[in-house]
Amino acid sequence: MSLVILNWNGREFLDTCLDSLERLDYPEDQLELVLCDNGSMDGSVEHVRTRHPKFRIVALDRNHGFAEGNNVGAKKAAGEWVGFLNNDMEVPADWLERLLTPLDTRPDLACLASRIVSWDGGTIDFIGGGLNFQGHGLQLDHDAPSSPQDVARPLLFACGGAMLVRRRLFLDVGGFDPAYFAFFEDVDLGWRLNLLGHDVWYEPAATVRHRHHGTARRIPPHQLRVLSERNALYTIIKNYDDANLALVLPAALMLLNEKALLMAGVDPARFRVDGAPAPATPPPQPRTGRPDALARVRQRGLAGAGQAALRRAHRAAAALTNTPEPVVTPAAPGGGMPDTALSLLVAISETAHGMDALMQKRAWVQSRRRRSDAEVLGLGGVLLEDPTFGHAGYLDFQHWLARVAGIDAAFESVKL
């Protein structure tokens, strides 16, 4: 067993995390502890070398991101299983033994997901996830004190901040896609594993505490937005079957454009030739597809499908990306677009420039597919709401577009 803790300038969190791992009730001669450092400048490596000599240190020359940093750690590790833990986690002594318990009855499982709670232990952080149709990952019942979904079951994906996976399989299927850098690489990995016929399992008895996004707060919000939106596109391009991708990708691109215009406060009428007909304005749309869709969810910060829950969702998503709730300020003629709006266009551009590699990855996954989209997406569910932008007019447009494009009907059986 190898446990990899990825670190980037997180010295302030390390002692709590590493001390807890050193106290694990697990045979020392069967446990390899690895700190993979992403070029930290805060003395993290020197501190761990002195304070935590049990840890093998893999020191990288620069920040390779969450995805590739963990990939390097997995390649350097020696265990049959490799675990990934965020540096702002704390685990109880029995965490690892409990996480491995499902293998007693399901020895074929490929990946094991932990139960993650808030730092004070009072609310849910991760008990399973789904996604919205545009590819943004969701955490079910986030911030709730309890949940009926908090039971052992197969998942669409494990949270990359506290999971185990068979190391050889992880490497053979490509690991975390290094092109993601960070955000949704765990969603992509879980979707890929499931498509290839491998099971991801949630074990509620294996609980860890999470300080929550200590590293992400150091990254400017417009840069985080590029990662979030671009990686969502990467995920759907690689993993949807042909029919679903043909429905979703055009809509996802149109919605990114709509969101950018709203973020920038652009008035489309200013660009319309006098006398030209204005496009129709979609009428207000219902926010949920079914009465049972009111379960809280979060986009690695989203809460909810109902209106109150959805408002909480956007506050949570804003906290994740260090950005305020949606505020639309009219753009002056000739004025520049704000970076948060431009970040969506950059996400589209980076996706376009990466299409050659994306299509090769898609071909690899689709040629090895063993399960249908309905089977896989049903493990977490698909939300129609966008977890990243709570503008009421935008959500009306999104629901209208999903309906007229046939997306709503296509995902009826798995809709949150």
What are these regions, as identified by a protein language model?
Residues 20, 27, 37-46, 62:
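A conserved acidic beta->alpha catalytic loop
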Residues 123-126, 133-138, 144-168, 172, ...:
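A recurrent flexible, glycine/aromatic-enriched loop bordering the glycosyltransferase active site
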